[in-house]
Amino acid sequence: MSSRKYFGTDGIRGRVGQGVISADFVLRLGNALGRVLTAGRSKRPLVLIGKDTRISGYMFEAALEAGLVAAGADVQLIGPMPTPAIAFLTSTLRADAGVVISASHNPHYDNGIKFFSAEGEKLDDATEAAIEAALDAPFHTVESERLGKAIRTRDAIGRYIEFCKASVPRGFTLHGLKMVLDCAHGATYHIAPMLFRELGAEVVVIGAAPDGLNINDGVGSTHIDNLAAKVRETGAQLGIAFDGDGDRVLMADDQGNPVDGDDLLYVLARSWQASGRLTGTVVGTLMTNYGLEKALAALQIPFQRAKVGDRYVHQALVEGGGTLGGETSGHLLCLDRATTGDGIVSALQVLEALGRDGHSLREALSSLSKVPQQTVNVRLGGGAAKAIVEAASVQQALQQAQAAVQGRGRAFLRPSGTEPVVRVTVEADEAGLMQDTLDRLAGAVRDAA
């Protein structure tokens, strides 16, 4: 939807206390959602509210609850839970919507709101448009007898752990595996260690002491070096890192080498092809490494690229009948197991694949050769990023760059939609070619700016 006023590609996000990420706006947002859900129906809708561990979550949880109850919706407060857990619980508890208070991998001073439909999927454009329209209407409180009620759910953790365990065969075990878990001081801190221990693993845990301010602070999937160092220090066979809200996962092998989302896609695609589980096309994004594209082609596995954002990966999978896709950042979609990106479920799928194939993580990646890739952000002194990208001189430079790496890599430009920046990305099978092409293309963008 091109005319979004508040919603981005993944809900609403920003700095706490600024713009829309304020208590008064979130109060109105809850009321708007409640009015959309109650329209044309006599039964009170049920909305689940979950959050990650950042301190502002208390404030926004209360604001959402008040706005929803005022509009006549019932609320179940789930407390700190991974984003994908709220997607699952919304569906299994037969709720009409789920809301997550989280800014994912961002620092504690940011926060955001994500929404899920009754099916546990991200809201469609029409529903988001209806919420935005309701936001621009006055706050409404229903008559006292129609006010909603709010309760706190106590069994959510157990329900979600069983859901995750059900994503792998009943006989699946991790006995004999020593692993490091980095929970980013986020929403998986009280769930992931318990789950992997229940499956038999010896678990070393870091990033599992949230204080409201330390979420993603030097830990988690955006700081993978911390995990890698702990794997080497403890002699673990692998490490797993989640982000603050648990929808991303990255890993480290037994030598502490970082393993990103492209690597994990390869492990899963290759294993699923061999076992007959793979269906349709594997979906990556514009940022997916060219080496993965080549490796999948060698296995005769169809691959396509979507725009950056797991929303677009999901859309491409649904349209193409596929079940496996993801982003370099660690958003992985296993749609035959979960409706949305789920870090814990994705990690279990990788561990199951390794166990079935009899490989270590490092061995499973030995046949994948990624190419050097680099992105430069060119900040513009003036003019819109899209206009700079479309300038004749920049388009000519882009064509020359693409010709230089043809058959050996890719070159492309992405104008930022939120800041005066053009992102210049080049990848090639030889580092010198990549760097030279990148320098020339970035220079052309700077000259045009």
From Swiss-Prot:
It is an enzyme of class 5 (isomerase). Binds 1 Mg(2+) ion per subunit. Pfam families: PGM_PMM_I, PGM_PMM_II, PGM_PMM_III, PGM_PMM_IV. Its cofactor is Mg(2+). Coiled coil: none annotated. The modification Phosphoserine is found at residue 104. InterPro entries: A-D-PHexomutase_a/b/a-I, A-D-PHexomutase_a/b/a-I/II/III, A-D-PHexomutase_a/b/a-II, A-D-PHexomutase_a/b/a-III, A-D-PHexomutase_C, A-D-PHexomutase_C_sf, A-D-PHexomutase_CS, Alpha-D-phosphohexomutase_SF. PROSITE patterns: PGM_PMM. The active site is at residue 104. It catalyses: alpha-D-glucosamine 1-phosphate = D-glucosamine 6-phosphate. Activated by phosphorylation. GO terms for molecular function: magnesium ion binding; phosphoglucosamine mutase activity; phosphomannomutase activity. GO terms for biological process: carbohydrate metabolic process; peptidoglycan biosynthetic process; UDP-N-acetylglucosamine biosynthetic process. GO terms for cellular component: cytosol. Catalyzes the conversion of glucosamine-6-phosphate to glucosamine-1-phosphate. Belongs to the phosphohexose mutase family. This is Phosphoglucosamine mutase.
